[in-house]
């Protein structure tokens, strides 16, 4: 049996980690031999195939850049919606001074985030943190949460989050395809010539991977 389903399972379970360490494609001596042999046997015709694969890898890198940019654009949009939400709700008459002060503080933090210079992972982590803190403040005002304006913003933010996850999945798909391609023969020979290496896939921050503790809600 290749796999035995009767094997005892670890009580701790298993959570896979993302390995984004750089790994350059290194063709074996045999692969290099056949690569050169193809050139000789095809009397240089293989060169045009080589150029085609080289251009393909260049296009792939541009697609990865574009996919990464789409993640940042989606996060930028969610940030803008959150700021607009706080600006619209900050005049809520029943807010206590402490709550109002915290909301103003969160808005300032959002405004100070440099979307263009912050990595997608860090950007998502910062905005998630602020949104979580904001939701905690709004929990104290059930009548506000039931208002049409609040529900409208919440729906829009949820839509933006769905778009973010979609752009992340798209990025990972393109990056994984590129990573698989540069390690297969004979593309690995081309990749080595171009000094290419694996592209990092999206990795959740340590805080985002922590299980949500709901024990306090039962007390």
Curated annotation (Swiss-Prot):
UniProt entry tagged with the keyword Cell cycle: no
Membrane topology (UniProt): Single-pass membrane protein
Organismal lineage: Bacteria, Bacillati, Mycoplasmatota, Mycoplasmoidales, Metamycoplasmataceae
Protein's organism: Metamycoplasma hominis (strain ATCC 23114 / DSM 25592 / NBRC 14850 / NCTC 10111 / PG21) (Mycoplasma hominis)
Chain segments annotated as transmembrane: 32-52
Alphabetized UniProt keyword annotations: Cell membrane, Coiled coil, Membrane, Transmembrane, Transmembrane helix
Protein name in the entry: Protein LemA
Superkingdom, taxonomy of origin: Bacteria
Family the entry assigns: Belongs to the LemA family.
Any Gene Ontology CC annotation: plasma membrane
Record SUPFAM superfamilies: LemA-like
Cell compartments where the protein resides: Cell membrane
Disulfide pattern: none
Residue runs in coiled coils: 54-82
InterPro entries reported in the protein's UniProt record: LemA-like_dom_sf, MamQ_LemA
């Amino acid at each position: 049996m290749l796999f035995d389903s009767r094997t005892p399972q670890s009580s701790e379970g298993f959570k896979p980690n993302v390995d984004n360490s750089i790994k350059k494609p290194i063709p074996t001596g045999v692969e290099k031999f056949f690569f050169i042999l193809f050139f000789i046997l095809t009397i240089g015709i293989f060169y045009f195939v080589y150029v085609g694969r080289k251009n393909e890898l260049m296009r792939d890198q541009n697609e990865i850049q574009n996919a990464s940019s789409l993640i940042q654009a989606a996060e930028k949009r969610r940030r803008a919606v959150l700021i607009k939400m706080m600006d619209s709700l900050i005049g809520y008459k029943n807010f206590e001074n402490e709550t109002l002060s915290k909301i103003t503080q969160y808005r300032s933090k959002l405004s100070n985030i440099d979307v263009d210079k912050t990595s997608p992972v860090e950007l998502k982590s910062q905005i998630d943190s602020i949104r979580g803190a904001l939701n905690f403040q709004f929990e104290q005002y059930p009548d506000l949460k039931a208002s049409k304006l609040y529900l409208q913003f919440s729906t829009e933010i949820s839509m933006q989050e769905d778009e973010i996850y979609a752009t992340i999945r798209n990025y990972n798909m393109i990056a994984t395809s590129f990573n698989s391609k540069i390690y297969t023969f004979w593309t690995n020979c081309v990749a080595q010539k171009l000094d290419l290496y694996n592209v990092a896939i999206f990795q959740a921050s340590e805080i985002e991977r922590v299980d949500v503790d709901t024990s306090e809600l039962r007390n």
